[in-house]
Design a protein with these regions (language model features):
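GH16 jelly-roll
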Residues: 111-358
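Bacterial Sec-dependent N-terminal signal peptides
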Residues: 4-31, 102-120
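Short, surface-exposed loop/turn segments at beta-strand-coil junctions that are enriched for proline
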Residues: 80-86
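Surface-exposed binding patches on compact interaction domains or structured appendages
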Residues: 47-76
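A short beta-strand micro-motif common to beta-rich folds, especially ectodomain repeats
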Residues: 86-98
Length: 358
């Protein structure tokens, strides 16, 4: 039956019934290799079709078509600067009728800047806060919670802006600024997470921070486990905390089932950092399977060894993510009350850098 049908169709065909042949597309290059700095490239296009156009896959690519006529012209490709330390790729598709021709675009990774780190460590992630006006949503996540969510703190954490339009986070003059302010009777502030879904396991992590002033402030640079289930069993690492009621005294703490402040077994240390609320100072952690050490301006703040006592004492062999926040009041920040006349206040961060062993 199929053979007969094919024979009848074949016998009844004529030249006028032949399908229109697919258009042929030619381009003078089928690949673009761009440096991290980016650049502009021109690709010549011709087609036997009646018209042509392009489709772009890659947010770092901008393409414009300059038509000589319906069957020829140039594609102008703009490749944006790559600030990430990863190679990235995109694809430009030229279309004419049912025909397709692709142009592959590959861009080199940005070179890792030379930053000071312990010997044997290399930079794996950083944010210098020198691009744009808001945090990169691919790297950072805002917490959203109402007041008294934790530690009896008085602030409401919101995503970028308060209901009245006040910014709780912004990038300005090369710094991340976390603002805490009062609006319509409520306190608003920011709490942000770096790489909350993947975090890092071990490394040297450093931030440069200028702390806010005022009775009631409670800024922190700390870490929590990616796969969090319960506290303190899963651990908490406080690289730096300060409360405005005790200005310029910064502390580091480790929390676990075997050492927690609720039963006065916490692992913590406090030191005076002159000008912590007036200038930028560095706060860091060097974290391995064997030991955790925190630093203030390169000086050891706290050092704690893995004593081989199990997870109750050392739940720090899992990935943790970085947290920056500015709390107001609460069990510690408001232990002697708060002074709302200090508001608004700002915590400034110059950079966050993560290094791991090569």
């Amino acid at each position: 039956m199929l053979i007969t049908l094919f024979a009848l169709i074949a016998c009844g065909s004529s030249d006028n019934d032949d399908p229109t042949p697919s258009a042929a597309i030619t381009v003078d290059t089928e690949s673009i290799s761009a440096p991290a700095e980016g650049g502009t490239y021109t690709v010549k296009v011709t087609t036997t079709g009646k018209e042509w156009g392009t489709y772009v896959d890659g947010s770092f690519l901008k393409v414009s078509n300059n038509y000589t006529n319906a069957q020829a012209g140039n594609i102008v490709v703009e490749v944006e600067k790559n600030s990430e330390m990863n190679v990235r790729s995109g694809l430009i598709t030229v279309m004419s009728g049912s025909a397709r021709k692709t142009i592959a675009v590959t861009q080199a990774a940005a070179e890792a800047p030379e930053y000071e780190a312990p010997a044997g460590y290399s930079l794996v992630w950083h944010d210098e806060f020198d691009e744009g006006m808001e945090l990169n949503s691919n790297d950072w996540t805002h917490e959203v919670q109402k007041d008294h969510w934790v530690n009896n703190e008085l602030q409401n954490y919101v995503n970028h802006v308060s209901p009245g339009g006040g910014k709780v986070t912004e990038i300005k003059d090369g710094h991340l600024r976390i603002h805490c302010f009062k609006e319509n009777g409520k306190i608003y502030s920011g709490r942000v997470y770096a790489k909350v879904k993947e975090g890092w396991k071990y490394g040297y992590i450093e931030a440069s921070i200028k702390l806010p002033k005022g009775k009631g402030t409670w800024p922190a640079f700390w870490m929590m486990p990616v796969n969090f289930h319960s506290w303190p069993a899963d651990g908490e690492i406080d690289i730096m905390e300060e409360v405005g009621v005790n200005p310029n005294y910064v502390s580091s703490s480790l929390h676990a089932t075997a050492h927690v402040h609720s039963n006065n077994t916490q692992v913590t240390h406090e030191m005076y950092c002159a000008g912590a609320e007036d200038d930028f100072h560095t706060y860091a952690i060097k974290w391995t399977h064997e030991n955790i050490t925190t630093y203030v301006d390169g000086k050891v703040q706290l050092s704690y060894d893995n004593r081989g006592l199990g997870r109750d004492d050392w739940p720090y062999d899992d990935p943790f993510y970085v947290i920056l926040n500015l709390a107001w009041g609460g069990d510690w920040g408001g232990m002697n009350g708060v002074n709302e006349s200090a508001l608004p206040v700002t915590m400034e961060i110059d950079y966050v850098r993560v290094f791991q062993k090569k």
